[in-house]
Amino acid sequence: MEFHGWSFGSAEAVSGEVVFNTSMVGYPEQLTDPTYSGQILCLTYPLIGNYGVPSEELMAENLSLKLESEKIQPKGLVIFDYCEDYSNWEAEKSLEQWMKEQNLTGIYGIDTRELTKILRDKGSMSGEIIPEGAAKPEAPAKPSPADVCCKEVIVYKAETAQDVENINGSKAATTNGKKVVVVDLGVKHSIIRGLLARGAEVVRVPYDYDFTEMEYDGVYVSNGPGCTCNCEKTVEVLKKVLEGGKPVFGFGMGYHLIAKAAGCELVRLAHPHRSANQPVRKEGTNRTYISSQNVYRAVKAASIPSEWEVYFTNLNDGAVDGIRHKTKPFIGLNFAPEVCVGLTENVTPLDEFISKL
């Protein structure tokens, strides 16, 4: 199957798993999300590029102030129409300029709705973007957390009220004296900023690092690219952590690894959740939330141990989008814990995690 369009950005041919996202806004954040590492990302919103790209400014320890990582993560971008003219008070460059600087190959003029229907019905598949005159690309390597995680332990602190205001855009307590270990499978920088803005000290460790001898108050297990089969050492570490009682929180792949450590089985979703409008119901209540997800697996309901319970259920397909321990502060979710823009009158899952430290 072939789609023909016009190239923009890098002129290099690329290959990778083709995935989609149906969000209306947020392409700078999506393009820097480590979960998309090595993939070809198809955006369904019909016009991309009209508000440019914000500052790539980095804070201490290479923490991005605006984006989700230090660089673009996918190998390719597929869109319907590209807007060369951009306007936004935070914009510093055009999308195409950024793509050329970071060697991201793009194609526009594609019926992204039709492509997304194919991906939705048949599941993710490999694809190629080949600009005219370019050689056929090599077969893609399978993405892994090892490609995007930190290589050593990194400590982040928000030491002053001004630090917190710079991170969060609003004033908050400078510190709560709590230390959170972030297991980096490809952590989004907004998560680290969100933890700092809530007064925590963040210790970021590689995904296969045994941190159990460290002093900490809670553990956050991040999302990331690839398959949980690459993370057996992480599962073994989490098994030791779950023997204790300190708060543990994870989303995406982090949720899946917590579930495996607890003894759950994972199932591949017939239709991957790759959008910002996934409805989830909080069990035991009549409350429904609209969640942002980028996952292709969920926990098998029948495999959940007796000491755990379903926390959130997806209302589209009935998938288990969250579990929690009945007596200990352990939570895993398939969706982002909303640390940037959201319903400010609601307590987010990240707030709930911080409150239990």
Predicted regions: what they are:
Residues 1-208, 228, 340-342, 348, ...:
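RNA-binding accessory domains that recognize and position tRNA/RNA substrates
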Residues 287-328:
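Catalytic beta-strand/loop cores that center a nucleophilic Ser/Cys/Thr
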Residues 179-184, 291-292, 331-335:
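Active-site-proximal beta-strand elements of phosphoester/diester hydrolases
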Residues 179-243, 247-250, 257:
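Phosphate-binding active sites in nucleotide-utilizing proteins
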Residues 222-292, 298-301, 342-352:
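Cysteine-nucleophile active-site neighborhood
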Residues 111, 252, 295, 336:
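Active-site glycine-centered loops adjacent to acidic/histidine catalytic or metal-binding residues
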Residues 105, 179, 247-249, 265, ...:
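Proline-centered loop/turn at the N-terminus of a beta-strand
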